[in-house]
Amino acid sequence: MATVIARASESQHWYTQEGKPQYTVTAKNGVQRNTTLRDARTMNLVPSVTTILNAAAKPGLEAWKLNQMMLACMTLPRAPEESEESYIERVKHDSKEHARQAAERGTTIHGALESFYEGIMLAEFLDYQMGVSKAVDAHFGAKNWLTERSFAKDGFGGKCDLYTQDGEGVVIDFKTKEFRQEDKVEGYDEHLMQLSAYRVGLDVPKARCANVFVSVTDPGLVKIVEWTQEDLERGWQMFDALKTYWQVKNNHKVI
């Protein structure tokens, strides 16, 4: 297994066998473009954990998307003489815009949290940074935390938000979410599979794993969902089965 420091987003989904992100390649015209499955086959790249997880249904995400679509319908009146097709496309665009804004907000907060653990405090995001720091320290104690490390192992790759090798290790993934103190926050199987794969990929197979939920409704509010070792064993079995499905479906297996 190879592990390297990586600060870019994991959105392009591909890694070299040395653990380096390969999010783009140089096109024939000299311009950088997104890496494709065809490129991955040629370059022997491995898919990211999230790419593999995308092969499974995500009921929670689909329910959220449906809610966004319904909200768009409620707030966008149909114009006089507007065709049904045009109205539907406008509603789709509006609902996707909300999703895009939420994704951008999440990426920005992730970046601020990464900066904090690299020793950089940002006034604009101080509530988020201090909220996470206090919650993580209270839950896990003082650790030698490492940020945004990428890896490749056994046919998959990824990039972890925060982890430590202290003891048997701790692996953390940040999730931004709209919630308040009175709201119940819980993890889903996709979160469990992601963390179980990360701890295997990072060579800390017995690590404690947790999702750290960061409220975008109440900056500074943080809730931690730690998974049991029994859960994580089940998560790894699910991920490993899904990885095999992905490899067969896409006819791409790196040995």
Predicted segments, located by residue:
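Metal-dependent nuclease catalytic cores that hydrolyze phosphodiester bonds in DNA/RNA
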Residues: 1-157
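Mg2+/Mn2+-dependent nuclease catalytic core
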Residues: 145-251
